[in-house]
UniProtKB/Swiss-Prot annotation:
Its main location: nucleus. Substrate binds at T266, K286. This is JmjC domain-containing histone demethylation protein 1. It catalyses: N(6),N(6)-dimethyl-L-lysyl(36)-[histone H3] + 2 2-oxoglutarate + 2 O2 = L-lysyl(36)-[histone H3] + 2 formaldehyde + 2 succinate + 2 CO2. The JmjC domain mediates the demethylation activity. It comes from Candida albicans (strain SC5314 / ATCC MYA-2876) (Yeast). Fe cation binds at H269, D271, H351.
Length: 478
């Protein structure tokens, strides 16, 4: 299905008259804030909110929602020296007293019980991933770097906050998340400010904050000298299909440095675009709580995302009525990670993350051809839940056109890249259907039109070639 671009309703930053590269640059520079009621995202500067006010907002109500729900909720300063509490008003005046030293869902997280269901191996290869169809997360404990085709810039225990700051530069802007509100802090911090906070004693930190989006692909030493696991590089479809001569640079989502203080918590989410994730812990520890991407779990997840009070609803206990029966998420379990562990999260898995102690992690995202059906399913959920463009996989549609073009021209690689037991017919059917919808959207949407690569020639002619190829392979038409 086609994507509808999300934009700030108070400005024309994403109007059709602006070039796509300008949109990307603007998104990278702009701070956003989301209304907790209507879920619409706004540019902070369009709202004319004073800079010193932004970090004090706990629950934001946009101008359209203020008449119905009242003014935004701000932090309240506690007069008690030893306990720091936020008071947040919810539906019809209900009030929650929230300890700012930990997220209010953390108790539920820590007490969750479920039978762990992962694959534990010592060497990750493309062959293994395809043979197991990536049905479960994969853990490589204390991974042998050379055996897994991975390389760190220096020893893992030497990758400290000081080393990261030296590599990136202390004036590097940083998106910092406030753990209690699960909102980004505005204005962005500088890395030197984060270093000071990260090195502050736990008891002296005013709030729990988290950094999960520092992309380091082009950072000397830290990113440039880091090599992703070979299996990840072998399966990353963007690596395979992106044309180096393209006027747009490929998306930078392959190498992130995550820095989390003790008791950081990220609520349930699915990684953007249904990407798979590799994750290696350098110091500290992490605990994940997973739910598999079954049809029911994804339906519950989508409904949960649309709840006005989503932040205060514990996803594992969320219920909806389906076929006259109440259903709730099933199959949940936790996984603990320690320094040296390498971890793979398959496409579409719903997860929350807790940090039991200060930690530094390097990880990244990647699309695959074998996960195309799930990736498009997650893309549709993102569209239906109105996830803003800045939080989605960059140039997603362009990547899909290039993927189709590549495999049409390298047909002998298609089955080997999806695995012998994978349903290639379903993959091509879903991919072609998406491209047909996107082509239709491009007739009225300039952004969609720009994302169709010129290298494929006339899009409709190319789609007909794809249909003919699929029919030759499987004897069916879309």
């Amino acid at each position: 299905m086609p994507i509808n671009s999300e934009s700030c309703p108070l400005c024309k930053v994403h109007s059709n008259t602006i070039k796509k590269e300008d949109e990307d640059e603007e998104d990278n520079k702009t701070s956003w804030i989301q209304c907790s009621k209507c879920k619409v995202w706004y540019h902070v500067h369009c709202l004319d909110l004073p800079t010193d006010e932004i970090d004090q907002i706990v629950i934001y109500h946009c101008p359209e929602c203020v008449p119905k729900y009242g003014e935004s909720t701000y932090k309240r300063k506690s007069k008690r020296a030893r306990v720091s509490i936020d008071y947040q008003s919810l539906n019809e005046g209900d009030t929650f007293a929230i300890d700012k030293s930990s997220h209010f869902h953390l108790h539920n997280f820590l007490n969750f019980k479920g039978e762990t269901n992962i694959n534990v191996i010592d060497k990750l290869t493309k062959t293994y991933a395809l043979n197991t169809q990536m049905e479960k997360p994969i853990l490589i404990p204390q991974a042998d770097l050379s055996k897994n085709g991975m390389q760190l810039p220096i020893e893992k225990n030497e990758i400290t906050i000081d080393y990261i700051t030296d590599c990136c530069g202390e004036d590097t802007p940083l998106e910092v998340m406030d753990v209690i509100s699960q909102q980004g802090i505005s204005p962005p911090w500088k890395l030197k400010q984060w270093r000071e906070y990260f090195k502050t004693n736990e008891e002296k930190r005013d709030r729990i904050r988290n950094v999960i989006s520092l992309e380091i692909s082009d950072v000397a030493k830290l990113g440039v000298d880091f090599t992703r696991p070979k299996c990840v590089r072998d399966m990353d479809v963007v690596d395979r299909v992106w044309i180096e001569e393209d006027e747009q640079k490929r998306s930078k989502v392959t190498k992130y440095c995550l820095m989390s203080v003790k008791n950081s918590f990220t609520d349930f989410h699915i990684d953007f675009g249904g990407t798979s994730v590799y994750y290696t812990v350098l110091s500290g520890a992490k605990t994940f709580l997973f739910f598999p991407p079954t049809d029911n779990n994804l339906e519950l997840y989508k409904s949960w995302c649309l709840e006005p009070s989503q932040n205060f609803i514990w996803y594992p206990e969320y219920t909806i009525t389906k076929n006259k029966k109440k259903i709730k998420p099933t199959g949940g379990f936790k996984v603990d990670l320690q320094p040296g562990d390498l971890f793979i999260i398959p496409s579409g898995w719903i997860h929350a993350v807790h940090t039991p102690q200060d930690s530094i992690v390097i990880g990244g995202n990647y699309l695959t051809i074998r996960d195309m059906v799930m990736q498009l399913k997650i893309n549709e959920i993102e569209r239906e839940t109105k996830v803003p463009t800045k939080f989605r996989f960059p140039m997603f549609n362009k990547v899909l056109w290039l993927t189709a073009w590549y495999y049409y021209n390298h047909q002998n690689e298609f089955q080997s890249d999806i695995g012998e037991d994978e349903d290639g017919n379903a993959i091509l059917t879903r991919l072609i259907g998406h491209l047909q919808g996107h082509l239709e959207l491009s007739k009225t949407n300039a952004t969609a039109k720009r994302s169709i690569p010129k290298t494929i020639g006339k899009p409709m002619v190319f789609i007909n070639k794809l249909l003919a190829w699929k029919e030759d392979l499987y004897g069916t038409a879309v």
